[in-house]
Amino acid sequence: MAGVKEYKCPSCGGVLEFDSTLQKMKCPYCGTELEVEALEAYDAHLNDETPDDMTWDNVQGSDWEEEETAGLRTYICESCGGEIMTDESTAASNCPFCGNPVVMMNQFSGQLKPDYVIPFKLDKEAAKEAYRKHLKGKILLPKSFHDENHIDEIKGVYVPFWLFGAHADASFRYNGTKKAVWDDGNYIYTRTSYYSIFRKGELRFEHVPVDGSTKMADDLMESIEPFDFSEAVDFRTAYLSGYFADRFDISQDDSINRANARIRQSISDTFRGTVHGYQTLEEQDGNVRLTDRNASYALYPVWLLNTTWHDKNFTFAMNAQTGRLVGDLPTDNKKMILFMVGLSLIFMAIIFLFFYLRA
Protein backbone atom coordinates (compact mmCIF):
# COMPACT_ATOMS: atom_id res chain seq x y z
CA MET A 1 0.00 0.00 0.00
CA ALA A 2 1.38 3.35 -0.97
CA GLY A 3 2.33 5.64 1.89
CA VAL A 4 0.32 8.75 2.65
CA LYS A 5 2.10 11.89 1.51
CA GLU A 6 2.59 14.61 4.09
CA TYR A 7 2.50 18.28 3.22
CA LYS A 8 4.61 20.67 5.26
CA CYS A 9 3.30 24.03 6.39
CA PRO A 10 5.25 26.78 4.57
CA SER A 11 5.04 28.97 7.67
CA CYS A 12 6.14 26.75 10.55
CA GLY A 13 7.07 23.41 8.97
CA GLY A 14 4.30 21.47 10.71
CA VAL A 15 2.28 18.77 8.94
CA LEU A 16 -0.83 20.16 7.23
CA GLU A 17 -4.21 18.47 7.70
CA PHE A 18 -7.37 18.66 5.61
CA ASP A 19 -10.12 20.58 7.42
CA SER A 20 -13.48 19.18 6.25
CA THR A 21 -15.38 22.22 7.54
CA LEU A 22 -13.22 24.76 5.75
CA GLN A 23 -12.51 22.47 2.81
CA LYS A 24 -8.92 23.66 3.06
CA MET A 25 -5.59 22.38 4.25
CA LYS A 26 -4.89 23.75 7.71
CA CYS A 27 -1.88 23.69 10.00
CA PRO A 28 -2.86 22.56 13.53
CA TYR A 29 0.15 24.37 14.99
CA CYS A 30 0.05 27.90 13.57
CA GLY A 31 -3.39 28.00 11.98
CA THR A 32 -2.18 28.65 8.43
CA GLU A 33 -4.87 27.84 5.85
CA LEU A 34 -4.18 26.87 2.25
CA GLU A 35 -6.41 26.12 -0.70
CA VAL A 36 -5.83 22.60 -2.00
CA GLU A 37 -5.06 23.97 -5.48
CA ALA A 38 -2.50 26.40 -4.08
CA LEU A 39 -0.85 23.63 -2.11
CA GLU A 40 -0.59 21.44 -5.20
CA ALA A 41 1.09 24.27 -7.12
CA TYR A 42 3.42 24.89 -4.20
CA ASP A 43 4.27 21.19 -3.98
CA ALA A 44 4.87 20.99 -7.73
CA HIS A 45 7.37 23.84 -7.46
CA LEU A 46 9.24 22.08 -4.67
CA ASN A 47 9.35 18.86 -6.69
CA ASP A 48 10.88 20.76 -9.60
CA GLU A 49 13.77 21.99 -7.47
CA THR A 50 17.13 20.47 -8.33
CA PRO A 51 20.49 20.63 -6.55
CA ASP A 52 22.94 23.35 -7.49
CA ASP A 53 25.06 22.70 -10.55
CA MET A 54 27.97 25.14 -10.25
CA THR A 55 30.91 23.18 -11.62
CA TRP A 56 33.56 24.63 -13.90
CA ASP A 57 35.98 23.42 -16.53
CA ASN A 58 39.67 24.02 -16.05
CA VAL A 59 41.32 26.94 -17.80
CA GLN A 60 43.36 25.67 -20.71
CA GLY A 61 45.41 28.85 -20.98
CA SER A 62 48.51 29.26 -23.08
CA ASP A 63 52.20 28.66 -22.49
CA TRP A 64 54.88 31.30 -22.47
CA GLU A 65 56.89 31.77 -25.63
CA GLU A 66 60.65 31.56 -25.19
CA GLU A 67 61.18 35.13 -26.42
CA GLU A 68 58.62 36.38 -23.86
CA THR A 69 60.38 34.89 -20.85
CA ALA A 70 63.88 35.86 -21.96
CA GLY A 71 63.47 39.39 -20.58
CA LEU A 72 61.65 38.46 -17.36
CA ARG A 73 63.08 38.12 -13.87
CA THR A 74 61.61 36.52 -10.78
CA TYR A 75 62.10 37.72 -7.20
CA ILE A 76 61.40 35.70 -4.07
CA CYS A 77 60.70 37.15 -0.62
CA GLU A 78 62.36 35.05 2.07
CA SER A 79 59.96 36.36 4.74
CA CYS A 80 56.43 36.01 3.34
CA GLY A 81 57.20 33.73 0.39
CA GLY A 82 55.89 36.26 -2.09
CA GLU A 83 57.01 35.73 -5.67
CA ILE A 84 56.90 38.55 -8.18
CA MET A 85 57.99 38.86 -11.77
CA THR A 86 59.02 41.91 -13.76
CA ASP A 87 61.09 42.85 -16.77
CA GLU A 88 64.89 42.93 -16.57
CA SER A 89 64.99 46.75 -16.50
CA THR A 90 62.96 46.98 -13.27
CA ALA A 91 64.96 46.35 -10.10
CA ALA A 92 63.37 45.07 -6.90
CA SER A 93 65.04 45.27 -3.50
CA ASN A 94 62.03 45.00 -1.20
CA CYS A 95 58.88 42.88 -1.23
CA PRO A 96 55.80 44.96 -2.15
CA PHE A 97 53.72 42.85 0.26
CA CYS A 98 55.73 42.86 3.51
CA GLY A 99 58.61 45.25 2.80
CA ASN A 100 61.39 42.75 3.55
CA PRO A 101 64.34 42.15 1.18
CA VAL A 102 63.82 39.97 -1.89
CA VAL A 103 66.26 37.68 -3.64
CA MET A 104 66.48 37.61 -7.44
CA MET A 105 66.30 34.32 -9.28
CA ASN A 106 68.29 34.50 -12.50
CA GLN A 107 65.95 32.32 -14.53
CA PHE A 108 62.22 32.81 -14.97
CA SER A 109 60.18 29.63 -14.72
CA GLY A 110 56.78 30.20 -16.24
CA GLN A 111 53.38 29.24 -14.95
CA LEU A 112 50.22 29.70 -16.93
CA LYS A 113 50.46 32.79 -19.11
CA PRO A 114 47.85 35.48 -18.36
CA ASP A 115 45.11 35.87 -20.96
CA TYR A 116 44.43 39.54 -20.28
CA VAL A 117 45.85 42.57 -18.54
CA ILE A 118 44.35 45.93 -17.59
CA PRO A 119 47.25 48.38 -17.97
CA PHE A 120 48.07 50.92 -15.26
CA LYS A 121 46.01 54.05 -15.88
CA LEU A 122 46.96 56.13 -12.82
CA ASP A 123 50.55 56.90 -11.83
CA LYS A 124 52.36 56.97 -8.50
CA GLU A 125 51.55 60.64 -7.85
CA ALA A 126 47.85 59.88 -8.23
CA ALA A 127 48.21 57.14 -5.62
CA LYS A 128 49.93 59.54 -3.19
CA GLU A 129 47.21 62.15 -3.70
CA ALA A 130 44.49 59.55 -3.14
CA TYR A 131 46.21 58.54 0.10
CA ARG A 132 46.33 62.17 1.32
CA LYS A 133 42.63 62.59 0.54
CA HIS A 134 41.91 59.32 2.37
CA LEU A 135 43.31 60.85 5.58
CA LYS A 136 41.27 64.05 5.36
CA GLY A 137 38.07 64.39 7.34
CA LYS A 138 38.78 61.40 9.62
CA ILE A 139 37.82 62.95 12.96
CA LEU A 140 38.87 59.87 14.96
CA LEU A 141 42.30 59.63 13.32
CA PRO A 142 45.19 60.29 15.76
CA LYS A 143 46.76 63.68 15.02
CA SER A 144 50.24 62.21 15.26
CA PHE A 145 49.42 59.69 12.53
CA HIS A 146 48.45 62.51 10.20
CA ASP A 147 51.39 64.77 11.14
CA GLU A 148 54.20 62.23 11.48
CA ASN A 149 53.03 59.66 8.98
CA HIS A 150 54.88 59.18 5.73
CA ILE A 151 54.73 56.54 3.05
CA ASP A 152 57.52 54.02 3.51
CA GLU A 153 57.09 52.43 0.13
CA ILE A 154 54.76 52.53 -2.84
CA LYS A 155 54.83 49.97 -5.62
CA GLY A 156 52.73 49.20 -8.65
CA VAL A 157 51.73 45.54 -8.71
CA TYR A 158 49.72 43.54 -11.20
CA VAL A 159 47.53 41.25 -9.07
CA PRO A 160 46.48 37.88 -10.54
CA PHE A 161 42.75 37.32 -10.89
CA TRP A 162 40.70 34.38 -12.08
CA LEU A 163 37.72 35.61 -14.09
CA PHE A 164 34.60 33.47 -14.26
CA GLY A 165 31.66 33.74 -16.65
CA ALA A 166 28.48 31.68 -17.00
CA HIS A 167 24.79 31.65 -17.85
CA ALA A 168 22.73 31.06 -14.69
CA ASP A 169 19.26 29.54 -14.39
CA ALA A 170 18.04 30.04 -10.85
CA SER A 171 14.99 29.80 -8.62
CA PHE A 172 14.61 31.00 -5.05
CA ARG A 173 11.86 30.65 -2.46
CA TYR A 174 11.13 33.14 0.29
CA ASN A 175 8.78 33.26 3.25
CA GLY A 176 7.13 36.62 3.80
CA THR A 177 4.67 38.06 6.28
CA LYS A 178 2.17 40.91 6.25
CA LYS A 179 0.66 42.25 9.45
CA ALA A 180 -2.56 44.15 10.01
CA VAL A 181 -3.30 45.81 13.38
CA TRP A 182 -6.64 47.22 14.53
CA ASP A 183 -8.63 47.75 17.70
CA ASP A 184 -12.29 47.82 18.69
CA GLY A 185 -11.89 50.06 21.69
CA ASN A 186 -11.34 47.18 24.07
CA TYR A 187 -8.71 45.03 22.42
CA ILE A 188 -5.87 45.45 19.97
CA TYR A 189 -5.83 42.77 17.29
CA THR A 190 -2.94 41.67 15.12
CA ARG A 191 -3.42 39.48 12.09
CA THR A 192 -0.31 37.98 10.52
CA SER A 193 -0.57 36.53 7.02
CA TYR A 194 2.14 34.18 5.78
CA TYR A 195 3.21 33.91 2.16
CA SER A 196 5.51 31.75 0.09
CA ILE A 197 7.13 33.77 -2.69
CA PHE A 198 8.87 32.20 -5.66
CA ARG A 199 11.29 33.83 -8.04
CA LYS A 200 12.78 32.22 -11.13
CA GLY A 201 14.94 33.72 -13.83
CA GLU A 202 18.07 33.72 -15.96
CA LEU A 203 21.14 35.92 -15.60
CA ARG A 204 24.43 36.21 -17.44
CA PHE A 205 27.69 36.74 -15.58
CA GLU A 206 30.90 37.91 -17.21
CA HIS A 207 34.39 38.25 -15.73
CA VAL A 208 33.48 37.66 -12.07
CA PRO A 209 36.85 38.34 -10.37
CA VAL A 210 38.54 36.24 -7.69
CA ASP A 211 42.08 37.23 -6.76
CA GLY A 212 44.58 34.40 -7.04
CA SER A 213 47.16 35.54 -4.48
CA THR A 214 47.41 34.58 -0.82
CA LYS A 215 49.49 37.71 -0.21
CA MET A 216 46.56 39.96 -1.06
CA ALA A 217 43.75 40.08 1.50
CA ASP A 218 40.46 39.07 -0.13
CA ASP A 219 38.47 41.85 1.54
CA LEU A 220 41.07 44.41 0.45
CA MET A 221 40.89 43.31 -3.18
CA GLU A 222 37.08 43.16 -3.20
CA SER A 223 36.94 46.65 -1.67
CA ILE A 224 38.81 48.28 -4.57
CA GLU A 225 36.50 46.74 -7.16
CA PRO A 226 35.08 47.16 -9.69
CA PHE A 227 37.62 46.98 -12.48
CA ASP A 228 36.39 47.91 -15.95
CA PHE A 229 37.11 44.88 -18.10
CA SER A 230 36.27 46.80 -21.28
CA GLU A 231 39.76 48.33 -20.97
CA ALA A 232 41.47 44.93 -20.75
CA VAL A 233 43.83 43.94 -23.55
CA ASP A 234 45.59 40.75 -24.54
CA PHE A 235 48.58 40.19 -22.29
CA ARG A 236 51.96 41.45 -23.44
CA THR A 237 55.15 41.42 -21.38
CA ALA A 238 55.71 45.08 -22.32
CA TYR A 239 53.01 46.07 -19.82
CA LEU A 240 55.24 44.80 -16.98
CA SER A 241 57.88 47.46 -17.60
CA GLY A 242 58.27 49.54 -14.44
CA TYR A 243 55.83 47.38 -12.46
CA PHE A 244 55.73 44.05 -10.67
CA ALA A 245 53.42 41.13 -11.31
CA ASP A 246 52.41 38.86 -8.46
CA ARG A 247 52.37 35.21 -9.48
CA PHE A 248 49.21 33.32 -8.60
CA ASP A 249 49.48 30.77 -5.80
CA ILE A 250 45.75 30.01 -5.59
CA SER A 251 44.64 27.77 -8.43
CA GLN A 252 41.48 28.12 -10.46
CA ASP A 253 40.04 25.04 -8.74
CA ASP A 254 40.65 26.58 -5.32
CA SER A 255 38.96 29.82 -6.45
CA ILE A 256 35.73 28.21 -7.63
CA ASN A 257 33.99 28.26 -4.24
CA ARG A 258 34.51 32.02 -3.91
CA ALA A 259 33.31 32.60 -7.47
CA ASN A 260 30.20 30.49 -6.87
CA ALA A 261 29.49 32.32 -3.61
CA ARG A 262 29.70 35.69 -5.35
CA ILE A 263 27.47 34.56 -8.21
CA ARG A 264 24.90 33.01 -5.88
CA GLN A 265 24.81 36.08 -3.63
CA SER A 266 24.37 38.36 -6.64
CA ILE A 267 21.44 36.26 -7.88
CA SER A 268 19.86 36.19 -4.42
CA ASP A 269 20.17 39.98 -4.05
CA THR A 270 18.72 40.54 -7.54
CA PHE A 271 15.72 38.27 -6.93
CA ARG A 272 15.15 39.62 -3.44
CA GLY A 273 15.07 43.15 -4.86
CA THR A 274 11.96 42.23 -6.87
CA VAL A 275 9.93 41.25 -3.78
CA HIS A 276 8.08 44.15 -2.18
CA GLY A 277 5.27 44.82 0.27
CA TYR A 278 6.15 42.39 3.06
CA GLN A 279 6.98 43.29 6.65
CA THR A 280 9.43 40.40 6.88
CA LEU A 281 11.14 38.39 4.17
CA GLU A 282 13.33 35.35 4.71
CA GLU A 283 15.08 33.26 2.09
CA GLN A 284 14.20 29.60 2.50
CA ASP A 285 16.10 27.89 -0.28
CA GLY A 286 17.31 28.32 -3.80
CA ASN A 287 19.12 26.51 -6.55
CA VAL A 288 21.44 27.70 -9.29
CA ARG A 289 22.38 25.88 -12.47
CA LEU A 290 25.31 27.20 -14.51
CA THR A 291 25.82 26.56 -18.21
CA ASP A 292 28.11 28.02 -20.88
CA ARG A 293 30.84 28.29 -18.26
CA ASN A 294 34.25 29.82 -18.94
CA ALA A 295 37.21 31.06 -16.96
CA SER A 296 40.29 33.09 -17.79
CA TYR A 297 43.40 34.44 -16.09
CA ALA A 298 44.10 38.17 -15.93
CA LEU A 299 46.36 40.73 -14.26
CA TYR A 300 44.74 43.82 -12.69
CA PRO A 301 46.69 46.98 -11.71
CA VAL A 302 47.02 47.93 -8.04
CA TRP A 303 49.15 50.48 -6.20
CA LEU A 304 50.28 49.21 -2.79
CA LEU A 305 51.23 51.80 -0.18
CA ASN A 306 52.97 50.72 3.03
CA THR A 307 53.45 52.94 6.05
CA THR A 308 54.58 52.42 9.65
CA TRP A 309 53.23 54.16 12.74
CA HIS A 310 54.08 53.21 16.34
CA ASP A 311 55.85 50.07 15.08
CA LYS A 312 52.70 48.88 13.32
CA ASN A 313 52.46 48.38 9.57
CA PHE A 314 49.52 49.75 7.60
CA THR A 315 48.84 48.71 4.01
CA PHE A 316 46.65 50.62 1.58
CA ALA A 317 45.61 49.49 -1.89
CA MET A 318 44.46 51.65 -4.77
CA ASN A 319 42.74 50.52 -7.93
CA ALA A 320 45.18 51.88 -10.54
CA GLN A 321 42.39 52.05 -13.10
CA THR A 322 39.65 53.90 -11.16
CA GLY A 323 41.56 55.51 -8.26
CA ARG A 324 39.53 53.86 -5.50
CA LEU A 325 41.75 53.55 -2.40
CA VAL A 326 41.04 51.52 0.74
CA GLY A 327 42.91 50.62 3.91
CA ASP A 328 42.49 50.51 7.67
CA LEU A 329 43.40 53.53 9.80
CA PRO A 330 44.19 53.72 13.53
CA THR A 331 41.68 55.23 15.94
CA ASP A 332 42.41 57.72 18.70
CA ASN A 333 40.79 56.15 21.79
CA LYS A 334 40.44 59.50 23.58
CA LYS A 335 38.68 61.01 20.57
CA MET A 336 36.47 57.94 20.38
CA ILE A 337 35.38 58.33 24.02
CA LEU A 338 34.68 62.05 23.58
CA PHE A 339 32.76 61.32 20.38
CA MET A 340 30.57 58.70 22.09
CA VAL A 341 29.97 60.98 25.08
CA GLY A 342 28.97 63.78 22.73
CA LEU A 343 26.52 61.53 20.88
CA SER A 344 25.02 60.37 24.18
CA LEU A 345 24.51 63.95 25.37
CA ILE A 346 22.83 64.91 22.09
CA PHE A 347 20.58 61.84 22.27
CA MET A 348 19.63 62.59 25.88
CA ALA A 349 18.88 66.23 24.99
CA ILE A 350 16.56 65.14 22.17
CA ILE A 351 14.68 62.77 24.50
CA PHE A 352 14.39 65.50 27.16
CA LEU A 353 13.01 68.01 24.65
CA PHE A 354 10.56 65.45 23.30
CA PHE A 355 9.03 64.71 26.69
CA TYR A 356 9.26 68.36 27.79
CA LEU A 357 7.32 69.57 24.76
CA ARG A 358 4.72 66.82 25.19
CA ALA A 359 4.23 67.85 28.80
Where are these regions (language model features)?
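Residues immediately within or flanking Cys/His clusters that coordinate Zn2+
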Residues: V4-E6, K24, L72-T74, A92
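Short cysteine-rich clusters marking metal-coordination/redox-active sites
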Residues: C9-C12, C27-C30, C77-C80, C95-C98
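Short linker/helix segments within small regulatory modules
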Residues: E17-K26, T86-S93
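Short Cys/His-rich micro-motifs in 6-15 aa windows
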Residues: G31-A38, G99-N106
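Charged, low-complexity helical/coil segments in non-catalytic cytosolic or luminal regions
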Residues: T69, G110-T308
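Extended, hydrophilic extramembrane loops/domains of integral membrane proteins
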Residues: Y300-V326
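Juxtamembrane boundary at the C-terminal end of a transmembrane helix
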Residues: A349-A359
